[in-house]
Structures are given as structure tokens and as C-alpha cells.
Swiss-Prot record:
This is Small ribosomal subunit protein eS31. Its cofactor is Zn(2+). A zinc finger (C4-type) spans 27-48. The keyword Iron does not apply.
Amino acid sequence: MTKGKKTAKYKYYKIEGDKVIRLKKTCPRCGPGVFMAEHLNRYACGKCGYMEWKQPQKKE
């Protein structure tokens, strides 16, 4: 058995008509089905460690 709390993956999808919309970003290394965690300034994959930095928003 795994340690910790299990995730409810059904919360990461939205169904509109006949289409499925993924609400979270998927990892480009691991492929579809592995979602990336959204942090304040980055996206991170918990499986392989891949990380993408968010672009800072410009203030006008």
C-alpha cells in the first residue's frame, strides 16, 4: 500500500458534451496521465522531477 493520501484523479478532468478536458498540465516526459503540480512560480512533476518555470507577468 502507498503511504499518504490517495488523489482523486476524477477532479483533474472536466467533461463537456463528448469531449474530455484536462484541467491540469501533463508532464511532457512521462506522457498523458501524469499531471504536474502547480506551485506559485513553477510546474513540477512528482514522478520524474521535470520542472517548468512560469513566466513572470508584466505589470503595466
